Amino acid sequence: INMTGIKQRDELQSTIWKIANEVRGAVDGWDFKQFVLGTLFYRFISENFTSYIEGGDDSIHYADMSDDVITTEIKDDAIKTKGYFIYPSQLFVNIAKSAYTNPNLNTDLAAIFDAIEGSANRYPSEHDIKGLFADFDTTSNRLGNTVEEKNKRLAAVIKGVESLDFGNFEDNEIDLFGDAYEFLISNYAANAGKSGGEFFTPQNVSKLIAQLALSGQTSVNKIYDPACGSGSLLLQAKKQFDAHLIEEGFFGQEINHTTYNLARMNMFLHNINYDKFDIALGDTLIKPHYGDEKPFDAIVSNPPYSVNWVGSDDPTLINDDRFAPAGVLAPKSKADFAFVLHALSYLSARGRAAIVCFPGIFYRGGAEQKIRKYLVDNNFIETVISVSYTHLRAHETRRHL
């Protein structure tokens, strides 16, 4: 990346945070984040889709076309390629034009988001698109009490995002949209304190984890994060290594619905096509989604620290392929080792997992001691790295990799 690119990115990020703070008014940033992030995503997919339709032909201006010229064939082909469809009238640029004067802005936006999601119905991309805008509630009181107030706030967000200079879409050598999105997420997380850390791993730590998991590999079949949050760890693998290194794409599971949507948006924003990623919603420990996709050559994860799980209250779990080999389940009040054993069972013979863990699992007795012994006796542990809390801003304790 040249210095101009870095300067452009830094300027963009300071502008975007300023706008994010201006448009939220008195609403807490954490509660308002889905509107800013969702609008940024809406602009991105609009420009990405326009770029695809125009195909580099300067004589085509998709935003100026009439919706009537779109044939069934064009639409079908576009959805198979991009995963979704956006009519010219639905593009971000066209909604932004009349944002402040449109009395139906909130209902128009809701209808457009429904239409974009609905365009993927019965197509292979349906799972990746469905519900993407679910958290963008245009009727929310966080936007204001009356329709007029809501529309004014929505228009301010749209115009703010419109004012950001991402340069020419085709010429973007760095993931400016993706970087802006991740920058916003990290700032929201830092300002929210502990709650933010549950869905975002700081960039310096995620870089290290990606490097540990992929170092020395000439290719990996696919990469997986069993507690993927907003997808930042998976995406570091793409940033640190040539995307071609990861042959079959990116897989992740996330338990929180809002965060699951952020992760899917994050994949698109980093130019990962719908057929190259699969993010699932659900509890990895109880209902793992990717049993049929294993083994994985690379696993990266920063699972929640010492959370409760059903453990021994579910008698079937001790016979689960993931936990049976250790002969004991992780304690009900500390699921840390359950995530580690889950990752281990999903690794290929040549695979490597890099996982951020709470230090307690290295010295507590009982079941955790037995699991430690199992891991060490079978030579599954390559190394343990201590990371100071300053590298994990949202958590004021030490961590180990």
Task: List each language-model region with its residue ranges.
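Conserved small/polar residues in nucleotide/adenosyl-binding loops
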Residues: 390-397
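Glycine-rich S-adenosyl-L-methionine
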Residues: 322-346
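Conserved S-adenosyl-L-methionine
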Residues: 195-301, 306-308, 313-317, 323, ...
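Non-catalytic, mostly N-terminal accessory regions of nucleic-acid modification and defense proteins
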Residues: 1-208, 212-213, 217, 275-286, ...
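Soluble or luminal CAZymes and related metallo-dependent hydrolases
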Residues: 11, 15, 255, 335
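Glycine-rich, charged/polar anion/phosphate-binding loops
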Residues: 339-342, 385-389
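Short glycine-dipeptide loop
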Residues: 347-352
